A protein has these predicted regions:
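Bacterial N-terminal signal peptides that target proteins for export
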Residues: 2-11
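Acidic/histidine-rich, surface-exposed loop or edge segments in extracytoplasmic proteins
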Residues: 31-48
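Active-site-proximal beta-strand/loop segments in catalytic clefts of secreted hydrolases
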Residues: 38-42, 76-78, 115-120, 180, ...
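The catalytic-center signature of Zn2+-dependent metalloproteases
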Residues: 143-218
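Metzincin-family zinc-dependent endopeptidase catalytic domain
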Residues: 51-169
Length: 218
């Protein structure tokens, strides 16, 4: 006959085990951002696996944002755009992006559109700089569009502390989506020249935390 003491001990052991397991379970993100990804002709030409590459860039940026802010980026779809024409200017590409994928005609399956470009234009030039449609805020809504020129082929290999330069660029632009602005702090990823910087300054960190629950622009 099994004693009451042994039964109680077994129950307590099971409860301790379950509590220990739950302690290691990741907490759900505070915000999930659904991404519609688009890739241009040069991006597709350099890598037959362009779908996987685009998803990897978003996942790498998501790893960073989920760890730092509890914001998860999820790729809903990846498509070829523009299909044939090359557009070596990020301001022009952004204007076309907003026109061809207006918020009013969105089907509700995504929150933001990220267009990846493989055009070989220096980021020093205006035509080669990453772009967003707006600096997000709670009163007018968070940004909806990003144009991101990429420098080289990227392969996602899992979460890492060493961020690729194109991933850093995407982290920077997503910062704008949530209201982060350029600063003079050379150590901040929101400095205009953000290469090899991987941390937000205190002001922009607070802005993102405060805005992460805000609605997207309509």
């Amino acid at each position: 006959m099994i004693s009451h003491r042994r039964t109680i001990c077994s129950i307590l052991s099971a409860l301790v085990f379950l509590a220990a397991c739950s302690a290691f379970e990741p907490s759900p993100p505070a915000r999930v951002v659904r991404v519609k990804a688009l890739v241009d002709v040069p991006f597709r030409n350099r890598n037959p696996g362009w779908d996987r590459e685009a998803r990897g860039l978003i996942e790498a940026a998501s790893d960073y944002y989920e760890q730092e802010f509890g914001i998860r980026l999820t790729t809903q779809s990846v498509a070829a755009w523009p299909e044939n024409e090359r557009v070596p200017s990020t301001p022009t590409l952004l204007a076309r992006l907003v026109k061809q994928f207006p918020v009013t005609s969105a089907d509700g399956s995504y929150d933001i559109v990220v267009a990846f470009s493989g055009e070989n234009v220096s980021r020093i030039l205006s035509d080669g700089r990453p772009r967003v449609d707006r600096i997000g805020n709670c009163s007018q809504g968070l940004a909806r569009y990003i144009v991101l020129p990429t420098r080289k082929l990227f392969r996602y290999t899992g979460q890492t502390t060493e961020l690729d330069s194109d991933v850093l660029a995407l982290v920077h632009e997503v910062g704008h989506v949530f209201g982060a602005e350029h600063v003079d702090d050379f150590n901040s990823i929101m400095h205009e020249n953000f290469d090899y910087r991987s941390q937000f300054d205190a002001k922009n960190r607070k802005i993102i935390q405060d805005n992460r629950g805000c609605p997207f622009a309509k």
